[in-house]
Amino acid sequence: MFRLTLLLAYVACVYGGGAPYGADRGKCRGNDYEKDGLCCTSCPPGSYASRLCGPGSDTVCSPCKNETFTASTNHAPACVSCRGRCTGHLSESQSCDKTRDRVCDCSAGNYCLLKGQEGCRICAPKTKCPAGYGVSGHTRTGDVLCTKCPRYTYSDAVSSTETCTSSFNYISVEFNLYPVNDTSCTTTAGPNEVVKTSEFSVTLNHTDCDPVFHTEYYGTSGSEGAGGFFTGMDRYQNTTKMCTLNIEIRCVEGDAVRTIPRTSDGVGVLSHSETITVIGGCLSDVNVDIEYSDSNHPEEVDDFVEYHWGTRLRLFPSPKRCRLVS
């Protein structure tokens, strides 16, 4: 027990290190402090002066206890209490130890209402932009600014981070053909969409298109035929993918292959591509009109592309649903 007491006393003296010396015109060296005309050793960070110096004895320093600290050299009579635990919308960004205070910052999804000397004292949840709006910036305090998504953009998430991205949620594919005779047709829905008559078939193959095709029609007037494929409006296109449509118009007779040229390029801001192919020689005139649009902005002009070969056709017969083939 006697040896332990001596050891503790030695450790305390080591913190102080050295004996007081006289101040030079009231000034001490380095970080030493002046007391009663004597210069004494300051305690290092992480400790405090459990006993100040006196004639013949230097400062006695003791380590800070848990949840207390001193960040610099000092001769304070006690360590400073660390800030309380980070709770609520706060999360700990710096832990409390003997040389530094605890620092709290806002947890994810929150912004700072009241800053402290370090970190934040009070945080609040960031505003969440509703569907159809995106994050456009931040206030001076860090809250979210929401702006209605402009033309050809959308955000379908309720979020404090999502921005408006170029997208569409509706695709319509309409075709006009000449000459045709058969007024009856069948369709097949699934991975590919097909309209079929006794003279030809129109097959729509689609890759990486999120809007789902589920409606089709076909009708005739005289020797002209018209049909179409349409998606629902409940799914937006993922803008990291390219929606690709490959439309094959195949005559029952003939095997000559023609690629129909694009005659209208649209606005060119949405992620899509198309290929229109005619196989066989039963048709002299082909028009394919494809529209990509956002149903939440019906007042805006759609992204419209046109493919044409032969005479331009503008037939719009009364839609006729085809008989479904499973």
Swiss-Prot record:
Entry-listed glycosylation sites: N66, N181, N205, N238
UniProt GO BP: positive regulation of membrane protein ectodomain proteolysis; regulation of T cell proliferation; symbiont-mediated perturbation of host defense response
Signal peptide limits: 1-16
Disulfide bonds listed in the record: C28-C39, C40-C53, C43-C61, C64-C79, C82-C96, C86-C104, C106-C120, C123-C146, C129-C149, C164-C185
Pfam families (alphabetical): CrmD_SECRET, TNFR_c6
Gene Ontology molecular function: tumor necrosis factor binding; tumor necrosis factor receptor activity
InterPro entries: Poxvirus_TNF-rcpt-II_C (IPR010806), Poxvirus_TNF_rcpt-II (IPR011172), TNF_chemokine_rcpt-like (IPR051670), TNFR/NGFR_Cys_rich_reg (IPR001368), TNFRSF_N_viral (IPR034059)
UniProt xrefs under PROSITE patterns: TNFR_NGFR_1 (PS00652), TNFR_NGFR_2 (PS50050)
Keyword field: Disulfide bond, Glycoprotein, Receptor, Repeat, Signal, Virulence
Ranges for the TNFR-Cys repeats: 27-62, 63-104, 105-147, 148-186
Function, in words: Binds to TNF-alpha and beta. Probably prevents TNF to reach cellular target and thereby deampening the potential antiviral effects of the cytokine.
Official protein name in the record: Tumor necrosis factor soluble receptor
Native organism: Myxoma virus (strain Lausanne) (MYXV)
